[in-house]
């Protein structure tokens, strides 16, 4: 999700502050920017298609949460879509066509991921604090979780599932006030038991399990850092530490995806690009657009890597509209790089 000081999300009724980030890297043809840490390899992304235009009612469009369904179609959420326009789109990346998958009169959805437990697709609604689920065909909407956790409502941003189907959510509570009140929350797969795993965080945004499900990576938007939560067998925290400090310049950390080799793909709001790190914190590469394509684009919020292959699709947005771009990832896609 993107951050107010870089681009305010004005005109969204009932939406306090949506912080929707992009990806920070060096611009094509320019010297490496801050935070390259020797990772001077460039993964060049190419445009697939424009999916959305800025909405008249909200003044912008912001794509997020790309996730492949079982038929190989790519689902994408449009965070700022008003009532009556597609809030989740289904894309045929081969034919370069899209269609409405879901819309409603309530949600500002910031992420999407299929549950390994019931096969439904789960969406985080940043505005209401709810987590909703849909049938695989986009129908049968249900509220999976709603209400306060430890006396405070959520602003759920991204989500990740463990192997059993329990949810782990980045809660950006406190972001609109500029206060470090954010949390990482675990919700059991029944939706009845919610536990705070970490708190006092600065607008947590991206969240993903590592390649072997031993722990969680999560990013903090306003601190430009990635932390690691080592989990025990019960899914609670064994330890927590700052793992990577991202020198993004004007860019801020957004969503995280993890490939089969454990590499992290970190979105940075403020630049339409993405930074790639190893699990040991080494900067490996920068995903960037051709220089001619960067005008009118401000963020590359998230990425889905094709399961079992290396073709990756990232969501890129700005005043010029919402786009899909593609590049070759460093390793194959797995669940941790498919939604969230």
Regions found by a protein language model. Name each.
Residues 1-29:
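Secretory targeting and sorting signals
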Residues 80-85, 126-127, 175-182, 221-224, ...:
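Short, solvent-exposed loop/turn segments at conserved positions within beta-propeller repeat blades
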Residues 86-89, 130-132, 182-185, 225-227, ...:
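A short loop-to-beta-strand structural motif that recurs across blades of beta-propeller domains
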Residues 91-96, 135-139, 187-192, 230-235, ...:
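Short loop/turn segments that connect beta-strands within beta-propeller blades
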